[in-house]
């Protein structure tokens, strides 16, 4: 063994440098969040649980154009449109999303011309069975009603970048 190797092993240089590094970070503020008691900041572009939105008068926004169904890469969206109404518009009779298939890419939200389908701020939607992850129109509208204020705020915050 050479002399410098002996000196390093006797003086425990690696141990001392590692210990000094640990001591330096010991007294700094912690970077972790005490979840679920503390919630971290989420971006306005966060993609969580899907929701169908309504207009302020209570009418659903979806016009049954089926662009979200066509663009979905996972083929997780199924839409059936009702007959045209007297004013020429259509509404959906069935709007299903298979959340097991969904990859949360956000393409459905980007394709929607009326901001009807959005990915909301909720990320805590655990279930006990796979069947509960098959969202129908009523579940999606209920999500939209529950999260509308936060969804509208996120869309407004993201509007300059769209």
UniProtKB/Swiss-Prot annotation:
The 4Fe-4S ferredoxin-type domain, residue ranges: 52-82, 93-122
GO molecular function list: 4 iron, 4 sulfur cluster binding; iron ion binding; NADH:ubiquinone reductase (non-electrogenic) activity; quinone binding
Details of cofactor binding: Binds 2 [4Fe-4S] clusters per subunit.
Keywords, in A-Z order: 4Fe-4S, Cell inner membrane, Cell membrane, Iron, Iron-sulfur, Membrane, Metal-binding, NAD, Quinone, Repeat, Translocase, Ubiquinone
Task of the protein: NDH-1 shuttles electrons from NADH, via FMN and iron-sulfur (Fe-S) centers, to quinones in the respiratory chain. The immediate electron acceptor for the enzyme in this species is believed to be ubiquinone. Couples the redox reaction to proton translocation (for every two electrons transferred, four hydrogen ions are translocated across the cytoplasmic membrane), and thus conserves the redox energy in a proton gradient.
EC number, as in UniProt: 7.1.1.-
Protein origin, superkingdom: Bacteria
Bilayer topology: Peripheral membrane protein
Subcellular location(s) of the protein: Cell inner membrane
Record text on subunit structure and interactions: NDH-1 is composed of 14 different subunits. Subunits NuoA, H, J, K, L, M, N constitute the membrane sector of the complex.
Residues reported in the UniProt entry to bind [4Fe-4S] cluster 2: 72, 102, 105, 108
Annotated residues for binding of [4Fe-4S] cluster 1: 62, 65, 68, 112
Coiled coil regions in record: none
Class in the EC hierarchy, top level: translocase
Principal location: membrane
Record flagged with keyword Kinase: no
Name the UniProt record assigns to this protein: NADH-quinone oxidoreductase subunit I
SUPFAM superfamilies reported for this sequence: 4Fe-4S ferredoxins (SSF54862)
Catalytic activity: a quinone + NADH + 5 H(+)(in) = a quinol + NAD(+) + 4 H(+)(out)
Family per record: Belongs to the complex I 23 kDa subunit family.
